[in-house]
A protein has these predicted regions:
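C-terminal catalytic "cap/lid" subdomain
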Residues: 1-233
Length: 233
């Protein structure tokens, strides 16, 4: 199946489970608030350099013979621990088409689940939107969504308690400090760098914004400034 279709299906079934879980938890706490999932299409640039340098590993592990068959189909493959996996492009998000729907639902008092999996990557072809064979980095789409909503806070939840540099936990960074650490290569290009980069993009795109990265289990404390790594302009 095309990657864009896989993204759409993932958004649908994960959104279904997530919105029902959130709704159930709210009702258990005596809170009556509607929860909605929005199937979200995100525009990417045809000329994004990521399409010439795919980096996102997807799919199952393959044998050398299976990998060769994938390459004959025109797909990119990379060796990983003696096996092979497919890799695809991970372009930056340019625009979010359903942003007005998300805003309308928020204004109506709903909790909105949007841009799941980084959004469905699409390109404009006249009046149509054509799915792209790509996976958008979720951190960048989260930052784009928060920016377009003019949010004051971006909260990125992960398995880490804090970001680290040289093995030392980071409590707070300005955008300039974060950029310097990125330039010096302190963050892993696959796992932590996109999170820091996305946070810098968010806080520098507006005024009085804060981005926070921390452990999922600490969300309550993170939003109150007690834990995690905070990035400001």
């Amino acid at each position: 199946a095309p990657m864009s279709l896989c993204g759409a299906m993932s958004q649908g079934y994960i959104g279904y489970d997530l919105q029902n879980a959130v709704r159930s938890e709210l009702l258990n706490r005596g809170i009556f608030k509607p929860v909605s999932t929005v199937i979200t299409q995100v525009r990417v640039d045809l000329f994004d350099k990521a399409f010439n340098h795919p980096t996102k590993v997807i799919g199952r592990y393959m044998t050398a013979e299976e990998a060769e068959a994938e390459e004959e189909k025109g797909n990119h493959v990379v060796e990983e621990n003696g096996s092979y996996r497919r890799i695809i492009a991970s372009p930056r998000p340019v625009d979010i088409y359903e942003i007005d729907a998300v805003k309308a639902l928020i204004d109506a008092g709903q909790i909105v689940i949007a841009a799941g999996g980084g959004g469905i990557p699409v390109m404009e072809q006249g009046t149509k939107l054509k799915g792209a064979s790509a996976v958008i980095e979720k951190d960048y789409t989260a930052a784009k969504l928060a920016d377009m909503l003019d949010a004051s806070t971006l909260l990125i939840l992960t398995a880490r308690d804090q970001m680290e540099a040289d093995g030392k936990p980071i409590d707070a960074l300005t955008s300039e400090e974060a950029i310097q650490l990125m330039d010096e290569g302190h963050f892993d290009e696959i796992t932590t760098l996109p999170k820091i980069d996305a946070c810098v993009s968010f806080v520098t795109s507006g005024e009085e914004r804060t981005a926070i990265i921390g452990n999922l289990d600490d969300a309550y404390h993170l939003i109150r400034g007690r834990r995690g790594t905070r990035i400001t302009k």
